[in-house]
Amino acid sequence: SKSCNMMTRNLRFAALLLLAGVFAAAPAVQGARPGKKKAQTVRLMDYNIADGMWYDQYNRYDRFVAWVRTQDPDVFAICEGATHWNEHKKTVSKEQMPRYLPDSLHLLAERWGHPYTAIGPYQDNYPVVFTSKYPIEVVQRIGEGLSHGALHVKINGVNYVVLHLWPQRYSMGDKTRKDNGGEAFRVEEMRRILDATILNPKFAGEKHWLMMGDFNSHSPLDKPFHGTRNYDVHDLVRSAYSHDIVGDWFSGEFVPSTTGGKARIDFIYCTDGIWDGVKRVETVHDAFTDKASDHRPIVVEFRTPKKTK
């Protein structure tokens, strides 16, 4: 009967809503907004969201979504894109994962207007991910020999690499935790990432690159503010990338990327063509970022180079 069919359709619709769960709790913003102006200017945000934004996990991510909407990035690079603790601070099981990140990243990203997502090699609880208003071409997921991995994507002719280097003083795999090999391991991670991306001969024709994320290491540009540290990671990076965007934009200043205000370990590097188009740079300080993570987000606006491959 018509009434039975109507009831069946209603039940199916209700079931679909339940499957969407917490990530569909708020209406999705419209996705890509095509237009010449948007295609020419990119607003990039890089953020280590700390344990898959565990801070707002039990609020249906409503505050996080509202905050991302106010920032309105075109491209969003995220470190620690997995939730691995449930509300009882127990490890999230495989059965629970569809409720959380990264399994439901696409549903969460839709809420802030990004219909496109990409997830790096999910080899531990700290994957890197991208969300975007524009189509994402996944060039490669880089995991071998790395702790948290790296993700290389291409969006509108620009190459983006997001990474998260090893955070400890000791090297990965050292069970004694006393070898003090952490920095050497980070250098090897960076060497692998550079060799796979910007230094790879097969990408010789690619001129426009950005590399970002949590480097867990210090820059020589900040030596006047914190004294001498080990700069091997960034010396290696600077041999391939000409600009540390925050360090060069705020030349002569110390702009920490941690909420504690004592360290700059999150970076966005770029090549000359990108740097020439940079219009705005900001490390975001507000009521949300003061509490949501131990890292602060970095926002960069740049004009897309005219010639992109």
Residue ranges and their predicted role:
Residues 81-168:
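Structured beta-strand-rich core segments of catalytic domains in phosphoester-bond hydrolases
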Residues 21-22:
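Classical Sec-dependent N-terminal signal peptides that target proteins to the secretory pathway
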Residues 74-75, 115, 240, 244:
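Secondary-structure boundary/capping positions in well-ordered alpha/beta enzyme cores
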Residues 5, 9, 15, 25-110, ...:
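N-terminal, active-site-proximal structural segment of metallo-dependent hydrolase catalytic domains
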Residues 1-3:
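Serine residues within intrinsically disordered or low-complexity segments
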Residues 78, 119, 270:
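Short beta-strand and adjacent tight-turn residues that come in two discontinuous sequence segments
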Residues 31-67, 128-309:
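Active-site regions of metal-assisted phosphoester/phosphodiester hydrolases
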